[in-house]
Amino acid sequence: MAIPKTAALPLGYTPAGGRSYNALGRNVKGVAAQRAISDSMAVTDTAVARSILDTLVAFDTTSSRSNLALIEWVENYLAQFGVQAERVANEAGDKANLFATCGPSVAGGVILSGHSDVVPVEGQAWSSDPWTVREAQGRLYGRGVSDMKGFLALALAHVPRLAKGTCPVHLAISYDEEVGCKGAPAMIERMAASIPAPRLAIIGEPSSMRIITGHKGISVFEVRVRGHEAHSSLTGHGISANMVAVEIMAHLSDIARKLEAEADADNGFDPPQATLTIGEMEGGTAANILAGHARFVFDLRAPPGVDTAAVLAPLRDQCAALDAAMKARFAGTGVKLTQIASAPPMTPDGSDDASAFVRQLTGENAPASRVAYAAEGGQFQQAGFPTLICGPGSIEQAHQPDEWMDLEQFEAGARFMDRLAEQLA
């Protein structure tokens, strides 16, 4: 089904606070986009979702920025259909989660969850403006179309129908998923305390509409090394922070190889082993100066059942030994290892009830699978919600320049939401 071109949606809106924004979050004089959406309900939900996607993508919600403009837009959109939302803000007050119940407040509902933040575009060679959805050759291009504003747009487009159902859908929108799943826990805790027990939680990460019942957990660490500067020809007169950092990184590589050799090849994950990768590194000021500082960040992604504390125990011992040896030579030097983020794995629980329900929505009978990336599924599962992942688009098309989603996937996501609305009517 082609997406009707007549469903274009005005992006300006005027929230209750009196400020006017365009979808970029800049103050403008606009019309109420929520009213425009209401007027467009005569066209297909897919077309409405496509218009909402334009709006959501145009908000720059890179994890380093505030997401409040997007959250306010969603609040006002939901309010038009009588759906009241609750914010769960961060300590600084510049970001917020949002959750809302469409339909009656009764047990047995479905959580639809997605994150509002996206990865940066800086340093990437985009063919067009990443904050404007471009349609070409059967694809939708733009930052977040696949991961995961496409899913959010589809869910929001179906709110008018979901709000009239006899069984609730609980919408959950988080922040800071891309930097260690930091935002969702506070929202999940609040939801667990305030909504009747749901049947399941569906995390709409891009899975090509396949059912995912397991994902790896993630732990992110920062290593800072403080050296003692001296001329690089006088190595005994100082300590190069870079050389110490390289020694620690070499140990990480050894641990990674050991994990690969000991992995359970039949655990359903690809790759099957827990992985260690270094994503950031910096240090030193000049080639002829023993580096006074060094810093690097690494992550550990482990499948369920891996004792991550045991995996990293040798590294902690090494850092402690290096720290003591450096301090014995020069005061103020040393090594500091800090965990800066973590999220648990999602473990297949052996129950087929949730998967069977979602198969009715996807229309596919393919067996459930597992993925190597981390997501918020494990956090929902730890709160006692039966949880799985299913969403349009592919993780292989996310996080890269010209991020894209097949129109066929977007339409498959719309059919999924249509069937959900029918099931809960």
Segments predicted by a language model, with ranges:
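N-terminal, intrinsically disordered charge-dense segments
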Residues: 18-37
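Acidic/His- and Gly-rich active-site-bordering loop/insert found
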Residues: 40-145, 164-165, 394
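Fold-level recognition of mixed alpha/beta catalytic cores in primary-metabolism enzymes, strongest
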Residues: 137-140, 145-146, 150-254, 270, ...
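Metal-dependent amide/peptide-bond hydrolase catalytic core
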Residues: 44, 91, 222-425
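Short, positively charged low-complexity motifs
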Residues: 9-10, 34
